[in-house]
């Protein structure tokens, strides 16, 4: 049954993409109206001197909307703009997956390489887990957040933050999996932390440096980086916030904010527009790699779901289920003080990105609200 569903999704992608070259073009009046409504939406949600968001809309290779709202923090009150860098949270996973695909292209690993081939001292169940399982969230690994001791707030959060190597150590102490690898789907931050470590080990250089040299700089994404406290600095940085008892407070770091492969990248609208262009023209990925990226995982048990439980589809680092009949690749991110989302509608050449440094803005739903203005 799940195989049939996956086949239907792939057929839908092929049919929808077949029309992409002849997709209807919006006239300037409609684009202007959609952009005006987008501006009205965010202006109504965000006051001038409070944490805010940055919003980007790219249509048919043209940036039709790009604007910042609110401020980067409550100390400097610097206004958010298109060069403000936000923690991307799980939008990072698309870059981690891309890094793995580069290593496969170079012949350094295979998608069927097993975890114990890379980490020989990993528990025996690692013999059943492949890189493909990690990419598609079908490994059965427990989430490392469930293995950590609770944070009591007695020490500064930076002193108790878990790093990627700490996650590996925790998993090595785990004697069993949540389920047999490949039999069901469960979103796994642990898997993507391990993928970052795999990149590091197989490339022979730190994960952050590999991303910068082999991915970000070649695409002109000069401000994008995997942040490591004490090693690099985030330029024009936005800090995360939450509202408590009616007042805003900085909430930028948590015990899990220092891991890289699952959520450690910072970026801005200018750089992400370049990333969207690379995706649009497939300048970074070869056709066979692109096809793999968009191929939905097939499992016998429970399959991919959206945060609200809606059935979904997942490829390599991206959700790939259509929306309102449009071929789509997308992801969302949630971490301490930040909410992020990217929506790419492949048949309409439309990309929507929302980056927020406050937790009360649901970037995923807002990005779809924006998309509907340009798709309708």
Give the positions of each predicted feature:
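Catalytic loop of the DD-peptidase/beta-lactamase superfamily, centered on the K-T-G motif
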Residues: 2-7, 11-67, 200-213, 217, ...
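Solvent-exposed coil/turn segments that connect beta secondary-structure elements
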Residues: 60-62, 72-74, 139-140, 359
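Alpha-helical scaffold elements that line and support the substrate/ligand-binding pocket
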Residues: 55-62, 87-110, 114, 134, ...
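Catalytic-site signature segments of enzymes, centered on catalytic residues
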Residues: 68, 145-149, 154-233, 257-273, ...
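Charged/polar, low-hydrophobicity segments characteristic of intrinsically disordered regions
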Residues: 129-137, 224-239, 303-316
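Active-site-proximal loop and beta-strand segments within enzyme catalytic domains
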Residues: 51, 74-188, 205, 242-252
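Secretory-pathway/luminal and periplasmic proteins that interact with or process carbohydrate-rich
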Residues: 64, 122-130, 140-147, 179, ...
């Amino acid at each position: 049954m799940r195989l049939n569903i996956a086949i239907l999704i792939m057929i839908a992608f092929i049919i929808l993409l077949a029309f992409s070259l002849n997709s209807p073009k919006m006239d300037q009046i409609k684009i202007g109206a959609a952009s005006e409504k987008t501006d009205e939406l965010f202006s109504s949600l965000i006051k001038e001197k409070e944490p805010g968001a940055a919003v980007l809309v790219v249509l048919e290779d043209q940036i039709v909307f790009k604007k910042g709202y609110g401020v980067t923090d409550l100390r400097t009150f610097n206004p958010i703009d298109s060069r403000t860098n936000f923690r991307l949270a799980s939008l990072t996973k698309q870059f981690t997956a891309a890094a793995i695909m580069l290593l496969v292209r170079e012949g350094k690993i295979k998608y069927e390489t097993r975890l114990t081939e890379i980490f020989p001292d990993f528990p025996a169940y690692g013999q059943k887990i492949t890189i493909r399982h990690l990419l598609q969230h079908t490994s059965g690994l427990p989430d490392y957040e469930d293995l950590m001791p609770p944070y009591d707030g007695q020490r500064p959060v930076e002193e108790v933050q878990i790093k990627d190597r700490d996650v590996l150590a925790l998993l090595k102490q785990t004697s069993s999996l949540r389920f047999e690898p490949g039999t069901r789907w469960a979103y796994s931050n642990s898997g993507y932390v391990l993928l970052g470590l795999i990149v590091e080990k197989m490339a022979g250089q730190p994960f952050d440096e590999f991303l910068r040299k082999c991915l970000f700089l070649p695409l002109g994404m000069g401000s994008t980086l995997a942040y490591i406290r004490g090693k690099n600095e985030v330029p024009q940085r936005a800090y995360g916030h939450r509202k408590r008892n009616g007042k805003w407070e900085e909430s930028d770091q948590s015990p899990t904010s220092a891991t890289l492969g699952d959520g450690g990248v910072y970026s801005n609208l200018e750089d992400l527009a370049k990333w969207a262009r690379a995706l649009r023209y497939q300048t970074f990925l070869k056709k066979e790699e692109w096809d793999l990226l968009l191929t939905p995982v097939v499992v016998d048990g429970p399959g991919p779901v959206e945060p609200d439980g809606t059935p979904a589809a997942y490829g390599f680092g991206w959700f790939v289920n259509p929306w309102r009949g449009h071929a789509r690749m997308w992801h969302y991110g949630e971490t301490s003080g930040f909410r992020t989302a990217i929506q790419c509608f492949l048949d309409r050449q439309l990309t929507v990105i929302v980056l927020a440094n406050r937790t009360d803005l649901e970037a995923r739903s807002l990005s779809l609200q924006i998309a509907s203005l340009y798709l309708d």
